[in-house]
Amino acid sequence: MTSRRLVFGLSALLAVLIIGLLIASGVRFDNQDVDPAPASSQESKRQALAEKSTLIADAAKRLAASSPNSSVFPRVESAASAYASALGGVWRPWPNGAPSGRTNPPVSTSAPANADASFLALKLGELSREAVAAANSAPASQRQTYLSVALDARLQAVGVATHAGGKASCGDVDPVAAGKAAATEEALSGVEAARQWLETDVASLPANQRQAGISRIDSIKAAQSAMISSGAKDRRPAVVALPKLAAGETLRGAALKRSSSALVSGAAKADKPNGEAAVSYACSLYATQEERDSAGTLLKK
């Protein structure tokens, strides 16, 4: 009798230990709902942007395969992949397969077989506008990522459209509105550095090739005045040292990157976000395809 009780007691103890280990490892014995919680409005926007970025990368990859001599499509594929990564990727509730009775929601990440350069430019433009909208409603900590995606995608859209013989717009360009949208001390100082570098670059050109550069500098001055009138503290240094250029980088390219970074950063910190003003103006500063090519990918993987 004592032996039976001992065996029973040990069996019960073993069962308790096994159940404890199962619970500790996450096994649940209740009828819990395994469905994910509904996505918030902001998460839905993020997911849509990640999906569209992945679709754009897929379209660019296909176009690159059919146009092996073009550098445009591989560049877009790399950029769009960087967007998707920066945005957190395409979320699936069950990435390794849904449990019995459940299915992963559909995602749109594959480009149509007949996607061409015009389709690619269209989707890049859509992505840019939607990223601006997401930035304007996002927490301040997330805005810079959205606005960086928006600006880079817009530059890529203009480049692809030009390659296809068409035209794409940077949007409604207004340096004063951009300055108001990015009115921070840091943005003002960043744009000041860019302005001084551009002045050095223009001075190195033949006299008959300077007008476009001078007009660009004048527009930056207008943006700076708007920043100051909107409350940005003016602590600009009298002289900004020239940057150390990477291999193949030009002073003009470095200046344009500095200005776009400052505008995006300033707009991301605004109390009342107006990302479109900053993005459209920053895009317009890249006046030629050569300059847009020099931007590279503003977001790195």
Go through each PLM region and give its residues:
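All-alpha RGS (Regulator of G-protein Signaling) helical domain and cognate RGS-like helical scaffolds
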Residues: 2-301
